[in-house]
Amino acid sequence: MPARLHARDLMTTELVTLTEDETLADAQRCMARGRIRHLPVVRDGNLVGLITHRDLLAASFSIFAEVDRGEQRRIFSTVRVVELMHRDVVTVPPDLAVTEAARILLENKYGCLPVVDESDLLLGIVTEADFLRLTVQLLE
């Protein structure tokens, strides 16, 4: 293990991503299939947003509280990800120390940090689970 770890050493690089035109139903399916909670939204490989499991839950409860399940599914299949995604996503460069990445996650209560290059090309994502894996490795 390197003496000083960086975001690139910890990030997940096999990513499931969405495009802006995909629907909330697509996001739900991707999250369920991959058992993931964060989906980067990309345009030509560049990060343009992020949608999370919490976003989908909030939309379900606030917008659709009075709507039956069938209608909710219909709406989720027509609403595009771009309408719900976070656009002002905090990102980190691949050479950021993992201690600093952890600090950013903790202080801001984020669940993930997309790792991008200087042109916003999505390289990977660092999640809470990545830090837990690292902790287990260090404790063994």
Where are these regions (language model features)?
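A glycine-centered beta-loop-beta connector
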Residues: 31-34, 39-55, 105, 113-129
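Tandem CBS (Bateman) regulatory domains
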Residues: 1-14, 53-90, 97, 102-106, ...
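The conserved cystathionine-beta-synthase
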Residues: 18-35, 41-43, 91-109, 116, ...
